[in-house]
């Protein structure tokens, strides 16, 4: 399992597929945002005076994230996206 550092968040992105005229078009290339499940969260970020600011998201949350941000990583057979918390636009309730 991946344990992110600082304000980084590990996401499992929901893959969407779209069919046009019998061809499958990957959804990630179509939308400005994508939906993902939070798998793991770093401890947060430190202020200039050393205080820890806890992240706003927690494992299990469903979030809306910008499409073209983050780093794709593999942990075994699983694919994840590691992003900074600032790239998460909203928590989906």
UniProtKB/Swiss-Prot annotation:
PROSITE patterns assigned: CHAPERONINS_CPN10
Gene3D superfamilies to which the protein is assigned, alphabetical: GroES chaperonin
UniProt-recorded name of the protein: Co-chaperonin GroES
Function summary: Together with the chaperonin GroEL, plays an essential role in assisting protein folding. The GroEL-GroES system forms a nano-cage that allows encapsulation of the non-native substrate proteins and provides a physical environment optimized to promote and accelerate protein folding. GroES binds to the apical surface of the GroEL ring, thereby capping the opening of the GroEL channel.
NCBIfam families registered for this protein in UniProt: PRK00364.1-4
Chief localisation class: cytoplasm
Complex and partners: Heptamer of 7 subunits arranged in a ring. Interacts with the chaperonin GroEL.
Keyword field: Chaperone, Cytoplasm
Gene designation per UniProt: groES
